[in-house]
Amino acid sequence: MLRLFARGHREEAVFGSLLRRIGCDAWLEEDGKQYKCSDVEGHFGGSLDGVLKKVPDIPLNAPCLAEFKTHGDKSYKALLKDGLVASKYQHYVQMQIYMHKKNLEYGLYCAVNKNDDSLFMEIVRLDRSVGEQFINRSRDIIYAKRTPKRLSESPGYYKCKFCDYSDICHFPKAQAEKNCRTCEHSFPVKDGKWDCAAKALEISKELMVKGCEFHEFIEDFKG
């Protein structure tokens, strides 16, 4: 997994170099760090790959989100055939959230096939309704008292079989770990922090992962 992340990180520099060579201005960092955005009192956010200007087919001085992705051969071919929205809607949503938060009217989706290094690029226009929809969805999930509704009641459903969280979703009572995030006494507060109602204190990162003597599973995780 670390090697996969490293490959993606290397491709960011490659894409930046390629875009500069065709005349684009490319900024991959802000003050020496990745561009970031957040919402829902700091509990939701992400990191932008960069910001571009002078992108062909985009108004000259319009800043543009840069989104760089690596794809396996099957995924890349689906992208070529069907386009971004149909084949990788989650990537499209990610871009819309970043564009909405950073007030960018355009985005450039850049994809590389890890098998043969072929490239795909697609210009994306801002649709604030999509960004707002999924930010509101994240807010509902973050502040929810119960776990979200399952995509399917069958763990054998094809999307569930490929989900990293299938076990905890379909068998929560057997899979839930004891920590503050599974405890009914914890609740999110400002600046991405969590408080404990039982102890009336802010939960540290160290305590968050192990819980305490007052731990009580939320309703969906109780045996």
Segments (PLM) and residue ranges:
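The N-lobe alphaC helix and its flanking beta3-alphaC-beta4 segment of protein kinase-like domains
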Residues: 12, 94-95
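A short mid-domain helix/strand-loop element embedded in enzyme catalytic domains
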Residues: 68-72, 113-114
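Metal-dependent nuclease catalytic cores that hydrolyze phosphodiester bonds in DNA/RNA
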Residues: 1-65, 72-74, 82-85, 205, ...
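Alpha-helix capping at helix-to-loop junctions
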Residues: 21-24, 71, 100-107
